[in-house]
Regions:
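Extracellular/periplasmic bilobed ligand-binding domains
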Residues: 199-291
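An alpha-beta-alpha
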Residues: 155-216, 239
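Extracellular/periplasmic periplasmic-binding protein-like sensory domains
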Residues: 253-326, 387-389, 393-394
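Hydrophobic alpha-helical segments within soluble ligand-binding/sensing domains
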Residues: 101, 158-181, 194-196, 222-226, ...
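Bacterial lipoprotein signal-peptidase II cleavage site
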Residues: 17-34
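Segments of small-molecule ligand-sensing domains
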Residues: 313-319, 333-395
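Extracytoplasmic "Venus flytrap"
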Residues: 40-42, 49-70, 92-98, 120-121, ...
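Beta-alpha junction/loop-to-helix N-cap segments that form part of ligand/metal-binding clefts
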Residues: 60-67, 82-149, 217-225, 250, ...
């Protein structure tokens, strides 16, 4: 089991979540028709697989990942591929389910996958990483943030880990004096949510605010939050921290409005996507804050070029998951070129070379400048704070 490496967050916090295969007809046909690129002239290609939810309650995440991965693969191939070899990419739906994610992994293995970019959400990612460890296959998850998701030595991530999200959130709330009394509503049956809560609670003691209510729910009780909200309201919570996914968060905001409770709401990367929830009154998310490494309205040239191309291709604004994924594919390219790997190498030999290369590269991407990785797979980069203003994500 890897040791968790702390991220250097303090400087950024002065300014400034998640993861089956279903090889259904729709998933397979999408992968076959839209997500495979032409092989190199000699027939040798790198085969990179992806896994995530493109149906179900977390589909906003998986769809963004699938889109951005293909964008990156198209760029890689247009620029000459990896070490002169073109890349084939195939994505499998896992519906944010661990068992289906393992099935998806097996489907991709049968296809000939040599490296895995995935999975998208934490619980499925943890299940799949146990399988990639058995096969010694290189794995880079864009967004699987649970500590356990990259426990094996072959697994790395682009996003922040859950513990670091919890610590960073508590620091931001405390340093910016957002509230004296804070409530937390979290999913005790989910490793992403409970992991963030635990380190948030620990760091809160150092930040000068009090957690006046810590209310849990489970996968079996995630449609009615009236009890948790009532306890937060009665405790006088001025801010409610929600280390959860956007679907449940949209229900909480709706129910809080119904009961006349109007605290500040604060989330992490799993909140990204709440403006796209079907039938949700997005005005209820006004002034909601979250920590994320990517803000689509940032004015730097790299972000604007990515957002413009993504909007043109998919008629949508990319979220953090899309940005993490675009970076992930280019990170794979950079590490593979550093390692000098070729498609004729075994999966295990590719993995061993990639593991070393990941600790030697420095990557400038959409989600961080001068990103580096330790041998335990953790990235060193810094988060940003984002607020929903006038129905749009806005950098703080």
């Amino acid at each position: 089991m890897k040791k968790l490496v702390s991220l250097a967050l303090a400087a950024v916090l002065a300014v400034s979540t998640v993861g089956c295969g279903s090889s259904s007809d729709s998933s397979s046909s999408t992968a076959d028709s839209a997500q495979s690129t032409e092989a190199a002239a000699d027939g040798a290609t790198f085969k990179i697989g992806g896994i995530g939810p493109i149906t179900g309650g977390a589909a906003i995440y998986g769809q963004a990942v699938m889109n951005a991965a293909q964008m990156a693969v198209d760029k890689i191939n247009a620029d000459g591929g990896i070490n002169g070899y073109q890349v084939e990419f195939r994505f499998e739906d896992d519906e944010h389910d661990a068992e289906k994610s393992v099935n998806a992994y097996n489907t991709l293995k049968d296809w000939g996958m040599q490296m895995l970019m995935g999975t998208v959400t934490s619980t499925p990612c943890t299940a799949v990483s146990a399988k990639t460890e058995e096969d010694n296959m290189f794995q880079l998850t864009p967004s699987g943030s649970a500590v356990e998701s990259i426990a094996p030595a072959n697994a790395f991530r682009v996003c922040f880990s859950d513990p670091n999200q919890g610590t960073a959130s508590a620091q931001y709330i405390g340093e910016n004096k957002l509230a004296n009394k804070v409530a937390v509503i979290y999913n005790s049956s989910d490793v992403y949510s409970s992991g963030i809560y635990q380190t948030f609670a620990t760091e809160a003691a150092n930040q000068g605010f009090e957690i006046v209510a810590a209310e849990a729910f489970t996968e079996d009780s995630k449609t009615d939050f009236s009890v948790q909200l009532q306890k937060a309201k009665e405790a006088g919570a001025e801010l409610v921290f929600l280390p959860i996914y956007y679907t449940e968060a949209s229900i909480i905001l709706t129910q809080a409005n119904t009961m006349g409770y109007d605290p500040m709401f604060f989330g992490c990367d799993g909140m990204d996507g709440i403006l796209g929830v079907e039938n949700f009154d997005t005005s209820l998310a006004e002034d909601l804050m979250l920590l994320t490494p990517f803000v689509a309205d940032a004015q730097d040239e790299k972000t604007q070029a990515f957002v413009s191309e993504y909007k043109e291709k998919f008629n949508d604004t990319p979220n953090q998951f899309a940005a993490d994924t675009y970076d992930a594919m280019l990170i794979i390219k950079e590490a593979a070129e550093k390692a000098g790997v070729t498609p004729d190498m075994s999966v295990s030999d590719i993995c061993e070379a990639m593991k070393t290369a990941m600790t030697e590269i420095t990557f400038d991407g959409l989600t961080g400048e001068r990103m580096t990785w330790s041998a335990d797979g953790e990235p060193a980069k810094a988060p940003k704070a984002m607020k929903i203003v006038d129905g749009a994500y806005t950098a703080m």
